[in-house]
Regions:
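Single conserved hydrophobic/aromatic residue that forms the stacking wall/gate
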Residues: 1-12
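Hydrophobic anchor at the beta1->P-loop junction of P-loop NTPases
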Residues: 26
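Walker A (P-loop) phosphate-binding loop of P-loop NTPases
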Residues: 30-31
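Conserved lysine of the Walker
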Residues: 34-35
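Short glycine-rich substrate-engagement loop in P-loop NTPases that contacts/grips substrate
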Residues: 49-77
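Structural recognition of the conserved hydrophobic beta-strand(s) that form the central parallel beta-sheet
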Residues: 107-113
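Short regulatory helix/loop adjacent to the ATP-binding pocket of P-loop NTPases
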Residues: 116-130, 146-147
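Interdomain hinge/linker elements that couple catalytic modules in large macromolecular machines
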Residues: 144-229
Length: 229
């Protein structure tokens, strides 16, 4: 889920995330830059001596729990725990709830790509962790990141009243067509974009949806075939 770092932090300032929350979640489709945003925030704002970044699919968790990790990290002076891809850890919401209640000095921040599973599990975290939903690039953000054309934010009323101006663009429609075709993902300029996009689709159809709906893998593949019709 690592996207190009160029300008991504500035692009997603619109999220207005309260990074000081005791616990928070950052969810969104695969490939929109959640991991990059985490790593940028750690690099720019955190002290490496009391900060730990882990991925929930790490082999460490085959024999250890999140609570075990938190306990060991806390005893070594840890204060900030970043957990990537939390949905890959079984019963993650229950353990996060326990960590929230048992370790008041430990800040926990997590990401998740399986939005359905994340919202299914947030019942255990109600009133404990704000969940921020991170989408792909808007047309305005796409122009800023890939064409260095900076357009201010307009309200719907301003757009409907034709008070919108896009400086530096004489003919915006070709750029908009380009955005519609491949502008949603920050990695759209990669040479391997089509391969990466297919991987995102396959992971969603063959893993995320079947896992959420308790379907087997073959059913997930059939669902993908139906969508291709």
């Amino acid at each position: 889920d690592v996207a190009p770092s160029r300008g991504l932090g500035d692009v997603y300032k619109r999220q207005e995330i309260n990074w000081d929350s005791h616990m928070l979640g950052l969810v969104g489709p695969r490939g929109v830059g959640k991991t990059t945003m985490f790593l940028q925030h750690i690099k720019q704002n955190m002290n490496p001596k009391d900060t730990l970044y882990v991925s929930a699919d790490n082999m460490y968790f085959a024999d250890n729990s999140l609570i075990d990790l938190t306990d060991k990290f806390s005893k070594r002076g840890g204060k900030h725990l970043f957990i990537d891809e939390i949905h890959k850890y079984p019963n993650w919401s229950r353990e996060l709830k326990q960590i929230f209640d048992s370790y008041p000095d430990m800040q926990v921040l997590f990401t998740g790509s399986s939005i359905l599973d994340i919202y299914k599990g947030t019942a255990d975290l109600s009133r404990r962790a704000p969940i921020y939903e991170m989408q792909g690039l808007s047309f305005r953000e796409y122009l800023s990141m890939f064409h260095q054309i900076h357009v201010p934010v307009y309200t719907l009323e301003e757009i409907l009243e034709h008070k919108v101006e896009i400086p530096g663009i004489a003919h915006p429609l070709p750029l908009f067509a380009e955005y519609i075709q491949h502008g949603y993902y920050p990695f759209s300029k990669d040479i391997t974009f089509e391969i990466e996009l297919n991987q995102v689709i396959n992971q969603t159809m063959e893993n995320d949806i079947p896992q959420y709906a308790n379907m087997n893998v073959s059913t997930g593949r059939k669902l993908k075939q139906l969508l291709m019709i």
